[in-house]
């Protein structure tokens, strides 16, 4: 298993789209169209050229996980596009934790002091993961930054970094 920064590759992009579609629409039944998240088709410009990053996890050259950091300003970043196929979650692989650790290393090295994220209300497994990582749920009116996301009755979480 390898976690690496995304490089423009049509084969990996197609697999990333499959992963996201599986997690959002087949598994979670959220009915989110790729047109609602066109950042996936402009990773370099949307994330990497703006002092953020996008990582993919590969097993035998197959994309099995992803996570992204979107820079909003010098202090705030958004955790986005965090997906893994079910068999890679939890023990024994723990890809979810490995991707999150990579994200946090970059966030701390980049001197962000706050991470925000959104996640659909019905994604209880995600809520549990984020809360175990120190994220606190906030109401939307407490979110003082703006970013685009496919809202599905979403919860907003924040984590302050040391």
Region annotations inferred by a language model:
Residues 2, 22, 113-116, 120-124, ...:
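C-terminal "cap" of GNAT-fold acetyltransferases
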Residues 5-88, 100-102, 106, 160-161:
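Acetyl-CoA-dependent GNAT
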Residues 62, 85-101, 109-110, 121-127, ...:
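Conserved glycine-rich acetyl-CoA-binding loop
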Residues 52, 65-68, 94-96, 134, ...:
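Glycine-centered flexibility sites
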Residues 33, 92-93, 116:
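A generic secondary-structure micro-motif detector
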